[in-house]
């Protein structure tokens, strides 16, 4: 029986597993991929979100911005801030116009500078273009760094494994896992954390 089972071995899943292990909990980390850190953490999360792209959700943007400085400080060796980052507001198809973006950024205290450049942007198509402070990071260095730490802990891992069924009891979760060899594995945990991204609704159902 585990204190926590964490589903999804991307940045959030590994980070949560390490933090829980540090606090003395028995943790199992599972992922349907053969290797950890292969999906959204590389494809979608390879930049430090500060909230600029959430103008329709102030709560989400605020949370992103609040934690960005801590994230940058803890991972400074992997951060790339040597480039210019722009957000363009489409004149015809955007659900947010330039004035709304400015009000949103001002409300959150996000830095921006309205600007105008040529290629690769179509200035005829854009209502406004903003230069902002938002950095990227190297996801492969992240993976190497965190897996090195993970392998030194007591966190148990099961890759090529997915949840076939989950049953919530009074104080525990009972899970049936299946790996790529079609082996069935039955495990129990007190707490279940879903840190997937692309398959989050598939698991929640």
Please state what every model-predicted region is.
Residues 2-28:
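N-terminal Rossmann-like FAD-binding beta1-loop-alpha1 element of flavoenzymes
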Residues 12, 35, 199:
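Conserved Rossmann-like nucleotide-cofactor binding loop
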Residues 21-42:
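Glycine-rich FAD pyrophosphate-binding loop
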């Amino acid at each position: 029986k585990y204190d926590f089972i964490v589903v999804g071995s991307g940045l959030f899943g590994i980070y949560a597993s390490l933090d829980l292990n540090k606090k003395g909990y028995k943790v199992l980390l599972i992922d349907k991929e053969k290797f950890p850190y292969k999906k959204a953490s590389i494809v979608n999360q390879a930049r430090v979100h500060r909230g600029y792209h959430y103008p329709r959700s102030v709560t989400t943007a605020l949370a992103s911005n609040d934690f960005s400085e801590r994230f940058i400080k803890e991972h400074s060796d992997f951060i790339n801030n040597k480039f210019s980052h722009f957000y363009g507001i489409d004149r015809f198809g955007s659900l947010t116009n330039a004035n709304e973006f400015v009000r949103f950024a001002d409300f959150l205290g996000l830095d921006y500078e309205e600007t105008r450049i040529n290629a690769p942007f179509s200035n005829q198509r854009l209502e406004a273009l903003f230069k902002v402070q938002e950095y990227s990071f190297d996801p492969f260095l992240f993976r190497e760094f965190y897996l090195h730490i993970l392998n030194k802990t007591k966190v148990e891992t099961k890759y090529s494994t997915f949840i076939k069924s989950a049953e919530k009891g009074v104080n525990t979760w009972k899970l049936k896992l299946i790996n790529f060899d079609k082996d069935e594995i039955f495990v129990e945990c007190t707490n279940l954390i879903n840190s997937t991204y692309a398959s989050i609704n598939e698991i929640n159902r």
